[in-house]
Amino acid sequence: GYGCPFNQYQCHSHCKGIRGYKGGYCKGAFKQTCKCY
């Protein structure tokens, strides 16, 4: 979700908008999960 697996930037900006998170990346076998950090 959130742009994954094709648009990692969308995932990153989604996570950046959540308080306490710096950004995000696509994880999983097929990079289909947006993981915030």
Swiss-Prot record:
Secreted recorded as keyword: yes
Main location class: secreted
Keywords of the record: Antibiotic, Antimicrobial, Defensin, Disulfide bond, Immunity, Innate immunity, Secreted
InterPro entries according to UniProt: Defensin_invertebrate/fungal, Scorpion_toxin-like_sf
Disulfide partners: 4-26, 11-34, 15-36
Cellular component, GO annotation: extracellular region
Domain of life: Eukaryota
Any GO BP: defense response to bacterium
Compartments in which it is found: Secreted
PROSITE patterns noted in UniProt: INVERT_DEFENSINS (PS51378)
Function: Antibacterial peptide mostly active against Gram-positive bacteria (MIC=0.24 ug/ml on Bacillus subtilis, and MIC=0.94 ug/ml on Micrococcus luteus, MIC>120 ug/ml on both Escherichia coli and Pseudomonas aeruginosa).
Other facts: Two peptides derived from the C-terminal region have been synthesized. The peptide Os consist of residues 16-37, while the peptide Os-C is an analog in which the three cysteine residues are omitted. Both peptides show potent bactericidal activity, and high antioxidant activity.
Family label: Belongs to the invertebrate defensin family.
Protein name: Tick defensin 2
Species of origin: Ornithodoros savignyi
Lineage: Eukaryota, Metazoa, Ecdysozoa, Arthropoda, Chelicerata
